[in-house]
Amino acid sequence: LDISFGKKEIFLQQPTRFYFPGLPQRAFFERDEFPWLSELEAKTPQMKAELEAMLGGKEQFSPYLDSGNNEPNFAKHLDIVDNLNWSAAYLWRYGKLDESITRQCPITMQALKSAPLPFIAGQTPVALFSKLKAGVKIPPHHGLLNTRLICHLPIIVPKDCGGLRVGNQTREWEEGK
C-alpha cells in the first residue's frame, strides 16, 4: 500500500557491470536460507578479537574506494574516495589472498571456509573487514552484479549506528548476525 500511495519507492536492481535478467528482485535474503551461516556467525567473538588486535596495531586499512579503481560510477561517491572515511582491510581482493592480513586472522579465514565462496581467477572471492568512521554515511549505490549475494557480518557495532538500507527496506545492524 505504501508504494500505491507514493509513500515508498520501487527499487529495482541496477548493477553497474553485469545484469542477468529474470533473477528475483529481493532486497534481503533471510539468514535461515543459508545452512552454512550459523557456523560462520558462531566464530564472531574470535573474529572480533582478531580484528581488534589489527585495529590496535599499525594502520592496515586502505580507502575502500580509490580513484585508481576502474569500477564504473565511483565518481559519484567522491566524498569517500581516496580517504579512510570508509576503508577496508582485504583478506581476498579480486581472488588474490593478502597474506599480510590473513596471517593475523586464522580464525576468520577458517570461518570463511564454511561459506560457498566462488573462485574465479582475477575476480573472486572478495572478503574484507570494512571500517566506517563515526558520522560518515555511505551514499546510496548499486552493486556491480546481480548474480551474487554480498553478505555482511557486523563484528563491531557502535551504539545507534543505524542500519543497512536496501531499496525501501532497512535492517538494523546486530553484532554477529
Name the predicted role of every residue range.
Residues L1-L128, L132-L145, D160-C161:
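Fe(II)/2-oxoglutarate oxygenase catalytic core
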Residues W86, E174-K177:
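Generic detector of bulky aromatic hydrophobic side chains
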Residues L128, H152-P154:
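Structured core elements
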Residues I155-E175:
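A short beta-strand-loop-beta hairpin characteristic of the jelly-roll/cupin
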